[in-house]
């Protein structure tokens, strides 16, 4: 049995759950109600954009990215604006992060790492040729599509964390130093293209080695290692790969290898295939200007989020590949999120999550919501409990942030979703494993659920 579902809508898009969060933006899964196609929508706080005086740069870079249709770059479909938000409609990429593969399986074979690196360089080179620089290449920005092809996200959208000063060069303070070029850390101004290339080199090293070239618990020592390019190759690295990486991870941007030179490198060229794509398609940039127009006639229609009722069958069908026992399956590949069901009351589930989180140095913030008309046949999507877990001590990629939601399936049955909101994937992996041990006695196995539903 099911009831009417009312979801939050923005224009023609029906918004779903949050799939990512950052300082300036939140990313939600959405569906085009006209075509049924899935998309991702990045939601920016307009006030923050205006406060940082980045309007013109954001408009310019989004305009450029709208014109780019490259097989290895996440595409921007359209941009919408309301009085308070900017909505960037993006291609939805289903394969997860490239670095999830490293977490699950360790380092890659050289030919596999080379293929991904070739696709990364293709994407970076193409965008650089159009004056767009990433400036924040890191694992979260490297996604895989359903065919296993690399997709680079957030090209042209990193300007929110940058500042251009009077010298005309980019300046930034970076909370993710492991992938960042020495000249960026020095904050003396830097060339966006050369900084991107350094990050590509760090990424290639991780693919080949299975670990970071620059790592230290002491931030100043880490900065010194990066500035002097102090790293050691693992013994299995081939000489041609070493030679290329040494030229990319050159701390002097003036002598660092360039992308045209990489394209001629013998190691890089092995098995290289140029990307095939067609740029000849109609597009419009009218929506980019309209986003920052204060006139309400240019604002997209927003509908407030309201409680939604789903039956248990719908809940499972909307959760692609849902395995309610996967939290405790040792063979299950690690992902950025997981779900399970429990017959325990929400407060007991919350207590167990706190038991797992606090010893690991997490601050736990609770939000309670009143349950809306619960009944035996429906799930109330008005979340009864929502937790935000934040690591007090910043890791190598800032503070790990974990979002947890507990939803009622029936008065005696709840579904719990745990996902990484922001921070380092490896850190979340450690938290995930500890959580699985702590919660074993509160999880209701998937076989039990299937018997209940049959």
UniProtKB/Swiss-Prot annotation:
Region PPI, residue ranges: 335-364
Annotated catalysed reactions: L-seryl-[protein] + ATP = O-phospho-L-seryl-[protein] + ADP + H(+); L-threonyl-[protein] + ATP = O-phospho-L-threonyl-[protein] + ADP + H(+)
InterPro entries assigned to the protein according to its UniProt record, in alphabetical order: Kinase-like_dom_sf, NAF/FISL_domain, NAF_dom, Prot_kinase_dom, Protein_kinase_ATP_BS, Ser/Thr_kinase_AS
Region (Activation loop): 154-183
EC assignment: 2.7.11.1
Domain of life of the native organism: Eukaryota
Domain Protein kinase residues, every copy: 13-268
BP terms from Gene Ontology: signal transduction
Positions that bind ATP: 19-27, 42
Signal sequence extent: none
Gene3D superfamilies with a match to the protein in the record: Kinase associated domain 1, KA1, Phosphorylase Kinase, domain 1, Transferase(Phosphotransferase) domain 1
Cofactor (UniProt): Mn(2+)
Ranges in a coiled coil: none
Pfam families referenced in this protein's UniProt entry, alphabetically: NAF, Pkinase
The protein's enzyme class: transferase
A GO term for molecular function: ATP binding
The NAF domain, residue ranges: 305-329
Keywords for this protein: ATP-binding, Kinase, Manganese, Nucleotide-binding, Serine/threonine-protein kinase, Transferase
Residues forming the catalytic site: 136
Function: CIPK serine-threonine protein kinases interact with CBL proteins. Binding of a CBL protein to the regulatory NAF domain of CIPK protein lead to the activation of the kinase in a calcium-dependent manner.
Domain notes: The activation loop within the kinase domain is the target of phosphorylation/activation by upstream protein kinases. The PPI motif mediates the interaction with the ABI (abscisic acid-insensitive) phosphatases.
Family: Belongs to the protein kinase superfamily. CAMK Ser/Thr protein kinase family. SNF1 subfamily.
Name of the protein this chain belongs to: CBL-interacting protein kinase 33
Gene for this chain: CIPK33
